[in-house]
């Protein structure tokens, strides 16, 4: 094994909780009670990223050992609904819903509560643990926001599933409301327990991806959600043309924000977008990226989301070996995912149990 990976294994042995068995820690090894290991350093992450391809299985083994020690054998699942689609004024280079692109993506107004209820019930019946209401655009109007809160209260009372919202910016003012700072608290009161808002990429690479809002708006929204007591779900998209330095920069920003859950997406190139010409990441590079994020974030939920079918193909089940402990299942915003039953069967075949929903409400 590469000496760097051997050192990481030794560190893992020193920091796992008592009684936890992993491939790299013997029961007799001295351990601290609850070592506050926050993960490897940025320099170490870049070193792991640059190890030769022949080391990939060892990299995955170390990441899986960290996952096993810190997150256990259980996984989380989530599904989303495209509750408001298209006509987005942002110019995100990857996005089929941007009005700056001609992609033929679906366009529709905010779905009503009955439609959202049907989507949530379908996912709950399949055993999915969380349901996300996702809308296009920088932020919702006050009327739209009120409608989402009304629907959330209905879902909270009718469906046994955790509720997540992804409604754009929360922390800046709007012409209609004057203050979106209250929105996070209103969502929590309505039964939403988690707020999703991706940074998409590193601050230093962001101008290559989006020019219609500043990176600090996204940072402020994540912080606003956390201040309101919502779990924060925040990650990005890999394969936009960023370097490993950018990926590690993003991961360290997420560590600074102390987010609860990190969704990792992979670019699914859509014709008509500025990145429609790009090729998907090679599968082994994608798995290495998941492993690096796990080593940087040993305590957090890491979910593999959009683009996994295109990027990973037959390697999709390996995301757990790479350190992930969750999947987004079903369809995505404008692209079809794998059949829901197929994903749930894969989880069962892998012996990956599901985190009880009440176990997801508290911070890891």
Swiss-Prot record:
Reaction(s) this enzyme catalyzes, per UniProt: (4R,5S)-dethiobiotin + (sulfur carrier)-SH + 2 reduced [2Fe-2S]-[ferredoxin] + 2 S-adenosyl-L-methionine = (sulfur carrier)-H + biotin + 2 5'-deoxyadenosine + 2 L-methionine + 2 oxidized [2Fe-2S]-[ferredoxin]
Cofactor comment: Binds 1 [4Fe-4S] cluster. The cluster is coordinated with 3 cysteines and an exchangeable S-adenosyl-L-methionine. Binds 1 [2Fe-2S] cluster. The cluster is coordinated with 3 cysteines and 1 arginine.
Cofactors required: [4Fe-4S] cluster; [2Fe-2S] cluster
Chain residue ranges for the region called Disordered: 14-36
Cross-referenced Pfam families: BATS, Radical_SAM
UniProt GO molecular function: 2 iron, 2 sulfur cluster binding; 4 iron, 4 sulfur cluster binding; biotin synthase activity; iron ion binding
Pathway connected to this protein: Cofactor biosynthesis; biotin biosynthesis; biotin from 7,8-diaminononanoate: step 2/2
SUPFAM superfamilies assigned: Radical SAM enzymes (SSF102114)
Gene Ontology biological-process entries: biotin biosynthetic process
Entry annotated with the keyword Kinase: no
Tagged with keyword tRNA-binding: no
Domain Radical SAM core stretches: 70-308
EC number annotated for this UniProt entry: 2.8.1.6
CDD domains per record: Radical_SAM
Alphabetized UniProt keyword annotations: 2Fe-2S, 4Fe-4S, Biotin biosynthesis, Iron, Iron-sulfur, Metal-binding, S-adenosyl-L-methionine, Transferase
UniProt binding sites for [2Fe-2S] cluster: 164, 233
PANTHER family: BIOTIN SYNTHASE (PTHR22976), BIOTIN SYNTHASE, MITOCHONDRIAL (PTHR22976:SF2)
Quaternary context: Homodimer.
Family note: Belongs to the radical SAM superfamily. Biotin synthase family.
Function noted in UniProt: Catalyzes the conversion of dethiobiotin (DTB) to biotin by the insertion of a sulfur atom into dethiobiotin via a radical-based mechanism.
HAMAP family reported in the protein's UniProt record: BioB
Protein name: Biotin synthase
Organism annotation: Nitratidesulfovibrio vulgaris (strain DSM 19637 / Miyazaki F)
């Amino acid at each position: 094994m590469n000496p760097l990976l051997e050192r990481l294994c030794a560190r893992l042995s020193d920091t796992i909780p008592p009684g936890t068995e992993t491939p790299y820690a013997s029961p007799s090894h001295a351990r601290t009670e609850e070592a506050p290991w926050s993960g490897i350093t940025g320099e170490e992450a870049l070193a792991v990223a640059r190890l030769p391809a022949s080391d990939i299985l060892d990299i995955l083994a170390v990441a899986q050992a960290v996952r096993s020690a810190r997150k256990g054998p259980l996984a989380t699942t989530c599904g989303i609904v495209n509750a408001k689609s298209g006509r987005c004024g942002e110019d995100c280079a990857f996005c089929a819903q941007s009005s700056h692109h001609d992609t033929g993506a679906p366009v529709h107004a905010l779905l009503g509560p009955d439609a959202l209820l049907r989507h949530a019930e379908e996912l709950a019946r399949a055993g999915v643990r969380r349901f996300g209401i996702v809308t296009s655009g920088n932020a919702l109007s006050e009327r739209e926001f009120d409608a989402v809160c009304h629907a959330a209260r209905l879902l909270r009372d009718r469906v046994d599933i955790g509720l997540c919202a992804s409604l754009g910016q929360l922390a800046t003012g709007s012409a209609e409301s004057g203050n979106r700072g209250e929105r996070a608290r209103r969502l929590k009161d309505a039964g939403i327990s988690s707020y999703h808002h991706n940074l998409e990429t590193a601050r230093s690479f962001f101008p290559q991806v989006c020019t219609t809002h500043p990176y600090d708006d996204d940072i402020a929204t994540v912080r606003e959600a956390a201040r309101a007591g919502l779990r924060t779900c925040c990650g990005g998209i890999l394969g936009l043309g960023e370097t490993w330095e950018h990926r590690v920069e993003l991961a360290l920003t997420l560590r600074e924000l102390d987010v609860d859950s990190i969704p990792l997406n992979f670019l699914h190139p859509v014709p008509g977008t500025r990145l429609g010409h790009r090729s998907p990441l090679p599968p082994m590079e994608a798995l290495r990226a998941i492993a690096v994020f796990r080593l940087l974030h040993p305590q957090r939920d890491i979910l593999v989301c959009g683009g996994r079918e295109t990027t990973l193909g037959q390697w999709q089940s390996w995301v757990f070996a790479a350190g992930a402990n969750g999947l987004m299942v079903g369809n995505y915003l404008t692209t079809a995912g794998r059949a829901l039953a197929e994903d749930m069967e894969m989880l069962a075949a892998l012996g990956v149990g599901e985190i009880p929903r009440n176990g997801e409400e508290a911070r890891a």
